[in-house]
Swiss-Prot record:
Keywords: ATP synthesis, CF(0), Chloroplast, Hydrogen ion transport, Ion transport, Membrane, Plastid, Thylakoid, Transmembrane, Transmembrane helix, Transport. It is a single-pass membrane protein. This is ATP synthase subunit b', chloroplastic. CDD domains: ATP-synt_Fo_b. It comes from the Eukaryota. Belongs to the ATPase B chain family. It is found in: Plastid, Chloroplast thylakoid membrane. The keyword Coiled coil does not apply. HAMAP family: ATP_synth_b_bprime (MF_01398), ATP_synth_bprime (MF_01399). F(1)F(0) ATP synthase produces ATP from ADP in the presence of a proton or sodium gradient. F-type ATPases consist of two structural domains, F(1) containing the extramembraneous catalytic core and F(0) containing the membrane proton channel, linked together by a central stalk and a peripheral stalk. During catalysis, ATP synthesis in the catalytic domain of F(1) is coupled via a rotary mechanism of the central stalk subunits to proton translocation. Component of the F(0) channel, it forms part of the peripheral stalk, linking F(1) to F(0). The b'-subunit is a diverged and duplicated form of b found in plants and photosynthetic bacteria.
Length: 158
């Protein structure tokens, strides 16, 4: 029987409810509950999450800044070392060129000395041969003289 008085009360009531757009005390209460819930969720969940995300973003930015600074420094060092390497190669090539020129000069001096020594030996040998030739001619002339004297004496004695 409790249902009957309730239904009767409903029928006698002249007030029509607005349904979804009923502007009574529940709407501001629901709005207040939503704002309070949003504020509580903001402090409990969203603030720590945003703090973590901000810290992560700052860490990533710092890491990127450090990495780009390191990359710039590495590029500078690479350029410096490549320049030093190029200079060292050029110096090494210059040293090799100078050493080759010096070696060529030493070789040419040695060749000239060897040629001079060879010419000296040839000259001395020629001189020795000339002396021996003259000695041989003198000896031969003396032998010819003695033989001719001998022949002459044999011819005259006979």
């Amino acid at each position: 029987m409790i249902v009957f008085p309730f239904l009767l009360f409903q029928m006698l009531s002249t007030e029509v409810e607005g349904g979804l757009f009923d502007f009574n005390a529940t709407l501001p209460l629901m709005a207040l509950q939503f704002i309070i819930l949003t504020t509580i969720l903001n402090f409990i969940f969203y603030k720590p999450v945003t703090n973590v995300l901000d810290e992560r973003d700052e860490y990533i930015r710092n890491s990127l800044t450090t990495a780009s600074a390191s990359l710039v420094k590495a590029d500078e060092l690479t350029k410096t070392y490549e320049q030093q390497l190029a200079e060292s190669r050029k110096k090494a090539q210059d040293i090799i060129k100078v050493a080759q020129e010096q070696a060529q000069q030493i070789v040419s001096v040695k060749i000239k000395d060897a040629q001079a020594y060879g010419e000296k030996l040839v000259s001395e040998a020629f001189h020795q041969l000339s002396i021996q030739k003259e000695d041989a001619l003198k000896t031969l002339e003396m032998q010819v003289d003695t033989l001719s004297d001998l022949i002459k004496s044999k011819l005259l004695n006979d």
